[in-house]
Amino acid sequence: APLEPVYPGDNATPEQMAQYAAELRRYINMLTRPRY
C-alpha cells in the first residue's frame, strides 16, 4: 500500500502545502481505486 504523505506543518510554504495536497489526492485515489 502507498505511504500516507506527511503533513508539512502549519508554517509550511505554499509550495510544500501544494505538494502535500497533490500527494494526498494521489494517495486517496490509490486507496479508493476498486480492486478487481
Curated annotation (Swiss-Prot):
Alphabetically ordered keywords of this record: Amidation, Hormone, Secreted
Gene Ontology cellular component list: extracellular space
Function in brief: Hormone secreted by pancreatic cells that acts as a regulator of pancreatic and gastrointestinal functions probably by signaling through the G protein-coupled receptor NPY4R2.
Family to which this protein belongs: Belongs to the NPY family.
Predominant location category: secreted
Listed CDD domains: PAH
Organism in which the protein naturally occurs: Tapirus pinchaque (Mountain tapir)
GO MF terms, alphabetically ordered: neuropeptide hormone activity; neuropeptide Y receptor binding
Name of the protein in question: Pancreatic polypeptide
Entries under InterPro entries matching the protein: Pancreatic_hormone-like (IPR001955), Pancreatic_hormone-like_CS (IPR020392)
Coiled-coil ranges (or none): none
The keyword Secreted belongs to this UniProt entry's keyword annotation: yes
Gene Ontology biological process: feeding behavior; neuropeptide signaling pathway
Gene3D superfamilies in the cross-refs: 6.10.250.900
Subcellular location field: Secreted
Residues found modified as Tyrosine amide: 36
